[in-house]
Amino acid sequence: MYNQSPSRRSAMGAGVILALAIGLGAVEVQAQQTIKIAAGAPLTGALAKPGQEVFNAVQLAVEEWNAKGGVLGMKIEVVAADDQGNPQVGVAAAEKVAADASIMGAVWGITSSTCIPASEVLEKANMAFITPGCSNPKVTDRGLKNMHRLCARDDFQGPAGIIFAVNDLKAKKIAIFDDGTTGPRGAADEAEKQAKAMGVTALRYVLRAGDKDFRAVLGTVPKDVDAIYASVWAPDAALMAKQLPDVNLKAKMIGPDGQFEPVDYVQAAAGAAEGNYVTFFVPDMNKIPAAASFVKAFEGKYGQISSYGPIAYEGANILIEAIKTAGKADRAAIRDAVRASKHKGVLGMEITFDAKGDVATPSLSVYQVKGKGFELVKTVTK
């Protein structure tokens, strides 16, 4: 697994270093050879594949900047922060990042449960936090100055899945699942609200992430449901798809962004996911002229783009552009420059942030599982 170790820290206690880093706010960089940004994601564990794609995309952006001379006259270095998709681990990783005064900001997160506490650590250190995939509304509703989200919120994504189920699939009775964790539960909550608002019967269920047999819960679902909104991550969605026939459930699944994984979902389901639907934050990259060079470079180095890579790449470029705009290695100035960003990159649209730090013009694409991957069905904007 491609991974870059964090820089060595002094023998001082981590708490003392963190206090110094927060207190200083800026770091003298004239004598330095590099300037650092962090890439935070689950780099080990069940969500390592999408997490590693986040890191790889940030690394690619940095390599491209370095090939042009870096930023502020210095080369850029990526520091890996493995949060394992675990809130406690994420906080510890964020504390290490905040304690390193040479790290100017972070592109971080695909799990909201980890993103929320980790961003609070970096907020105290005045560090910009840009997330490519943490979609729970609470991420930005807290009003943090450092928090920036490039993906759509779950109060857009959850309803979009239900609207598609009702209007396009003509569903009238929908089973809604989540795994009990912050991100998936948030999308499921919003999906349930939308279903009730549309006069559709919504039945709620909870699965435990990582279980090897969901049939006891799946077997309680009425056989006449028209659709299944499954707000779970890709590995669990694959298992669900394989076990639905065992309990005589024939309805198609609709899932949020965490299922946009050709390997961990589609291929792991071994054909059982065929025809299911997934909403994701990125349109078909092969149809965006501005994305051609990115797609070629990324896939030439790391293989097929599967999920959060394009958004993380945008995040890294926004962060580095903010460092350039700030004109100095000052965390607070860089944080403020991120909030004022106007960036047009590989997603084919101008990215700006609203007062909360949400992307101002979110969009979602609905994909259908076909063969070993996904085919675009439609794109919806808020």
What do these predicted ranges mean?
Residues 35-59, 81-88, 110-111, 177-185, ...:
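Extracytoplasmic "Venus flytrap"
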Residues 13-25:
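Bacterial N-terminal signal peptides
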Residues 297-309, 320-373:
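Segments of small-molecule ligand-sensing domains
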Residues 241-313, 374-381:
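Extracellular/periplasmic periplasmic-binding protein-like sensory domains
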Residues 50-72, 189-196:
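Short, polar/charged alpha-helical segment
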Residues 49-56, 70-144, 208-215, 233-238:
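Beta-alpha junction/loop-to-helix N-cap segments that form part of ligand/metal-binding clefts
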Residues 91-92, 136-138, 145-248, 282-293:
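Extracellular/periplasmic Venus flytrap/periplasmic-binding protein
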Residues 97, 101-110, 130-132, 173-178, ...:
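Periplasmic-binding protein-like
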